[in-house]
Structure formats: structure tokens, C-alpha cells
Amino acid sequence: AAAAVSVLAACAGNTMAPVASGKPAPFFVSSTGSGRGGDLGGLDGADRLCTSLAAAASLPGRTWRAYLSTQGAGGVNARDRIGAGPWANVKGVVVASNVTELHGANNVNKQTALTERGDVVNGRGDTPNNHDILTGSQPDGTAITGSVDTTCGNWTQSGAGAAMLGHSDRTGLDESVPAK
């Protein structure tokens, strides 16, 4: 489950809670993985990783959520974990106004899907290409159904299973609107 591959996760400030500043909640692509491949300690561990990375980058206090789905009984959709939007990158550029836009005609691309420190993530054409993001999700942000593991055992395994990935630069995907 991605044990030997460097993969990233996307983190979003949950906007279900009031945002005192009136600004969109930040959205970032993590610059650092757990060091254990797809074993992020489940959703709670992944959320803690997002919170830790945000705190280290002095991002405003939010309830941080990893953009990850889980499978099986009690499965969770990534799109349902991150609030209603809007979301902006750490430089204030709005990447999506709402959940529908986030999973459709959004502004997520190589120049806007920044790390928590505001750095561009290496993508297609860069060495190394680090655009793979763990999601365990379909392009619309819902969990993948069926018996094939696409979440590294719901983000608790690094030696077995597989993970569905997205691309932070949105290149190399199919040409459908949700995949772009």
C-alpha cells in the first residue's frame, strides 16, 4: 500500500465551524507523508498529520481534515469530511467555492495546489514527479465500493493493499470534468 512510494495527502480546513476571519478555509497538499506509506493511522491519524503540518506552518487554527475516503461498513466519503467550502490555498487563491465546484470545474492545478508552506508540488515534467495524492476516492469525492481495497486498509496498512490516487497538478488524468 504505497510503502515504497512517496505520496502526499490533501488537507482542508473544515468550514462547518465558523471562520472568524470571513476568509475561505485554507486547502493544502501536504509536503510530508507519515513515513509509513499508506498507514496514516486511519482517518484520525491522517487528520492529526494535517493538523501538525498546519501548525508547523503557522496556519490559522482550524479543524483540519485529510481528504480521504474509507471503505466497507461505515465507509466515509472524502467530500463529506471537509465542509461546504469555499477553500483557498495558503496564499489566498480560491481553489473552489463549494463541494460541487471542488469536484467539477475547480481551480486546482499545479500553480494553486500548494503545500502548507506555499510551495509548488513537483508535477508532470518535474524531477521527481510528486503529484500523486492519496484519496481512496472516486473523482466526485465518494468512496469506492466493492471488495478491492483502494484505501490501504482504511489508511492503516503499509505492506498490503492498494490506494486510489489523485494528481495535485490534475495532469495525467482522463479528460472528464471531475477528473480535471
Outline where the language-model segments fall.
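C-terminal motif of bacterial Sec signal peptides marking the signal peptidase cleavage site
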Residues: 7-10
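Secreted/extracellular ectodomain signature
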Residues: 13-180
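Bacterial N-terminal signal peptides that target proteins for export
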Residues: 1-2
